[in-house]
Amino acid sequence: EMLRSLVGSEMCIRDRHLTSRQSVEIPFIKLDDVENVKAALAEGDVEPGVCGPRVRTITACQGQAICPSGCIDTYSLAKELDDRYFAKELPHKFKFGITGCQNNCLKSEENDLGIKGGIKVDWRESDCIGCGVCVKACRQGAITLEDGKISVDKSKCNFCGRCYKACPTDAWDTVHGYIVSFGGLFGNSINKGETIIPFVEDKEKLLKICDAAVNFFEENAKPSERFKFTIDRVGREKFEEKILEAYNG
């Protein structure tokens, strides 16, 4: 029904565009037809998106439901965040982006708040056969095999989970979680979002962090000021304090 509504034959809508943020755009609608088009779309349960100073459409890659590299269920998380924040009024636009793994197909660090799936691993010696497949799978050079024992340099590990996925004997204990970045921009100004907590291990903590970030922006931003510039102006130390408080609370 949603697809039929988007075809828009009754209103003679011939132009449709899939936007970079995974929405459907219908250009060239005459002003007098706008309400009729909205009503026709509503019959198929298609709701208008948003623009302006508010939380925008939350975007996500396909995640572990489709992609073998995926570390998290991106779709259900995007739906939950959408239900929680979509169209929330703020001093300026605020974008969420969710990507399932370190391949970063959705480029999470370009968003005001980016979420990247990750897997924290711990070697389980009892099930290891010393084949060295995990060493070859690790692109960060974080894993070494010496005298039949695996060592992991935690400072190099980026939580990609390749070692765990490649292991033929499942010799790894794993925790699926999230790498969260803040303050990304990719437009007139470009900035790579930065992490504060290396790895967030459960969704409840993730949601608390998201709430803290959105609330910080709502309470401190000036009109038409993007999140990155609010953090810079108010002070990164104060922002980090709020995020750590939410994480530890």
Across the structure, where does each feature detected by a protein language model lie?
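A common structural junction motif
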Residues: E10-D15, L41-G49, W172, F217
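Single conserved hydrophobic/aromatic residue that forms the stacking wall/gate
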Residues: E1-G8, I13
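A gly/ser-rich beta-alpha-beta helix-loop segment of oxidoreductase catalytic cores
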Residues: H92-K120, R236-L244
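Flexible, glycine/charged-enriched surface loops at secondary-structure junctions
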Residues: R14-S20, C51-G52, P91-F94, L145-E146, ...
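Immediate flanking context of iron-sulfur cluster ligation sites
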Residues: D45-I58, R84-T99, S155
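Helix N-cap motif at beta-to-alpha junctions
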Residues: I29-V34
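Iron-sulfur cluster-binding cysteine motifs and their immediate structural context
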Residues: V133-V152, R162-Y178
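A hydrophobic, small-residue-rich beta->alpha segment in the mid-to-C-terminal subdomain
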Residues: G177-I179, G184-A221
